[in-house]
């Protein structure tokens, strides 16, 4: 069963938070968000992953406005305090209200990209069936994922030109997954 704490990157296995840890180096805890407007003028996506057994975090934010695309990628050593693993370089995810509202900020002047956008859920989170895959006797994948729809508000700025994000026309989805992959 998914609980509000499952929205944080604190999982120790492919199961919801209350279960035991794994030493598998492919254990991960990841966010993915996307947004687009109904006119096709903007598309953006964020991916952020924590790989605790490798002591690595990474993040990527991409935006397309008109015919211009800007991408920001960052990687860092993972903080041992899992509650401090929602910021990598210039990209951060803030859980404003678990399973309801998430804020993304990007501040990368060297790429000419800044953003402050918030996704407000328009659906309950859907827990997908646990996925498991083996290669012979070896487990290669075993993870849980939740997916959710929402509307976006805020702004994205490229080279000083700000684009307001209107929740009436900018929708998207997100997923959270954790386990071994």
Language model features by range: what are they?
Residues 1-181:
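Targeting-peptide/extracellular-domain and disordered-appendage signature
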């Amino acid at each position: 069963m998914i609980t509000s704490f499952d929205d944080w990157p604190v999982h120790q296995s492919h199961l919801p938070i209350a279960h035991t840890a794994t030493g598998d180096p492919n254990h991960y805890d990841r966010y993915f968000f996307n947004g687009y407007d109904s006119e096709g003028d903007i598309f953006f996506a964020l991916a952020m992953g924590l790989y605790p057994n490798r002591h690595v975090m990474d993040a990527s934010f991409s935006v397309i406005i008109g015919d211009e695309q800007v991408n920001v990628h960052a990687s860092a050593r993972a903080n041992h305090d899992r509650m401090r693993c929602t910021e990598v370089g210039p990209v951060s995810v803030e859980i404003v209200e678990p399973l309801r509202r998430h804020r993304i900020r990007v501040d990368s002047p060297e790429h000419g990209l800044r953003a402050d956008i918030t996704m407000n859920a328009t659906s309950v989170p859907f827990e997908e069936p646990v996925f498991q895959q083996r290669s012979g006797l070896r487990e290669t994948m075993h993870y849980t994922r939740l997916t959710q729809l929402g509307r976006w508000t805020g702004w994205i700025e490229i080279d000083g030109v700000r684009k307001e994000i209107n929740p009436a026309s900018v929708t998207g989805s997100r997923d959270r997954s954790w386990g071994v992959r």
